[in-house]
Amino acid sequence: MELKVLNTAGTETGEVVILRDDIFGIEISEHAMYLDVKSILANKRQGTHKAKTRSEVRGGGKKPFRQKGTGNARQGSSRSPIHVGGGTIFGPQPHTYEQKVNKKVKLLARRSALSAKAQAGKIVVVDDFRFDAIKTKPFADILKNLGLDAKKTLLLMPEYDMVVNRSGRNIAKLEIMTADKASTYDILYSNTLLVQKSALKTIDETLG
């Protein structure tokens, strides 16, 4: 697949890049993407939820009333789950939600996500750009020139750049990350992939 390279003004540079078919042109595996995204979201969960059982609730050590002679059903504790203020039966307990996915499946999922974006025409390749100072407006102007100012956009860069990162972190609907760190979820969550030209080499090295 061929894509025209744009400059920061939104016009064509005359240069064309070729996207590798084994990364951007494979048959999309929805199941692989499902497994990878599910594991990514599950692994973000802390799993620190906790409800106290009857043995953990404060109080309830004394028998509420004598065993016989009151006419009531016998009770051994005021912290029984049937009482208000009592423990919880089968409540949530701390545990890990971690889900493991094989490396080959994760690789297939990322390739499938990139192929889905490419087939939908949602990949924009732009010349590499940097800023001399941390300024949001020049960054916002670039997105506007490219017609991406109102869309959820993921900018993929070849390497981390503090100035670019800080310039864009206050722009709504924009995420910035290095090309080797973008997960299946990151790619699918965005509406458009804005890829710096030299980041394509990073993608080839990571997923090739």
From Swiss-Prot:
Residues 45-95 are annotated as: Disordered. Keywords: Ribonucleoprotein, Ribosomal protein, RNA-binding, rRNA-binding. GO terms for cellular component: ribonucleoprotein complex; ribosome. The keyword RNA-binding applies. One of its GO terms (biological process) is translation. Gene3D superfamilies: 3.40.1370.10. GO terms for molecular function: rRNA binding; structural constituent of ribosome. The keyword RNA-binding applies. InterPro entries: Ribosomal_uL4, Ribosomal_uL4-like, Ribosomal_uL4_dom_sf. Residues 69-80 have a biased composition (Polar residues). One of the primary rRNA binding proteins, this protein initially binds near the 5'-end of the 23S rRNA. It is important during the early stages of 50S assembly. It makes multiple contacts with different domains of the 23S rRNA in the assembled 50S subunit and ribosome. Forms part of the polypeptide exit tunnel. Part of the 50S ribosomal subunit. NCBIfam families: rplD_bact (TIGR03953). Belongs to the universal ribosomal protein uL4 family. This is Large ribosomal subunit protein uL4. It comes from Chlorobium chlorochromatii (strain CaD3).
